[in-house]
């Protein structure tokens, strides 16, 4: 009997040791993934500023944690998009509560939390105040496909008109999520834009393309006689061609290299 107990005790100890090692390995892997994501967020912030998406310390970017879909990393308040660091990135839950990090969170955190809550397919959310897209949001007109960048948001761009003020409550954030629907972005009337994606690369390139599409549209309309949009079948084919994941990565990596060359 004593030998049986001893055998069970040794077996239990071995099981605990295996679980401990397995848990430690998982934690280590998660830590490595988290670090890579934070590094990508830092690069994304620098690219956004280089592409004219900055507005002092306003604007924010978030990314859902792959190992816990109820948490996301987010840029903190009071710094520019190009000042994101490993140390100041916040970890936030889907109710907008900071669960890790000492910096102050953005009051518009609910744009991110409510979209991530409503859209399990979305991992990255960016909100900025780009000049042309914000101007377009103020006209009450949607984005037309006068250029290739505009095709990316064809039938995929909502409009939020409930307020022109900051999105500071869960209810307002939920309103933005409803305006987004199953689309790729939202024009916030007289305010700015929100763009989403499955990856950081897709979302950064998407918000840059939205601004380019809005710029072309406003220039065309300012010329006095708007050209007709592309035929629907052409737009849908073009949208498919420019929506491939590898294209987003290639273009994002190019912009990162350009930022690094410029110092």
Regions found by a protein language model. Give the residues of each.
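Glycine-rich flexible loops
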Residues: 2-10, 14-263
């Amino acid at each position: 009997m004593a030998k049986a107990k001893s055998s069970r005790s040794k077996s239990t100890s071995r099981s605990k040791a295996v679980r401990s090692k397995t848990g430690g390995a998982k934690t280590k892997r998660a830590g490595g993934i988290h670090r890579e994501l934070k590094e990508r967020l830092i690069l994304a912030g620098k690219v956004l500023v280089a592409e004219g998406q900055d507005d002092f310390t306003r604007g924010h970017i978030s990314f859902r944690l792959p190992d816990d879909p109820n948490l996301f990393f987010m840029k903190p308040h009071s710094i520019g998009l190009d000042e994101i660091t490993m140390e100041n990135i916040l970890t936030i839950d889907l109710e907008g509560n900071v669960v890790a990090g000492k910096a102050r969170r953005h009051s518009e955190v609910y744009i991110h939390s409510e979209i991530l809550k409503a859209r399990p397919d979305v991992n990255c959310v960016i909100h900025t105040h780009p000049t042309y897209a914000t101007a377009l949001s103020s006209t009450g007109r949607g984005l037309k496909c006068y250029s290739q960048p505009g095709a990316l948001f064809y039938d995929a761009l909502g409009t939020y008109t409930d307020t022109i003020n900051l999105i500071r409550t869960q209810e307002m954030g939920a309103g933005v999520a409803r305006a987004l629907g199953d689309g790729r972005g939202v024009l916030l009337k007289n305010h700015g834009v929100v763009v989403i994606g499955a990856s950081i690369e897709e979302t950064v390139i998407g918000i840059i393309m939205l601004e380019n599409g809005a710029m072309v549209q406003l220039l065309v309309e300012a010329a006095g006689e708007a050209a007709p949009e592309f035929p629907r079948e052409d737009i849908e084919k073009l949208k498919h061609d420019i929506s491939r994941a590898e294209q987003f990565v290639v273009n994002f990596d190019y912009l990162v290299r350009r930022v690094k060359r410029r110092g």
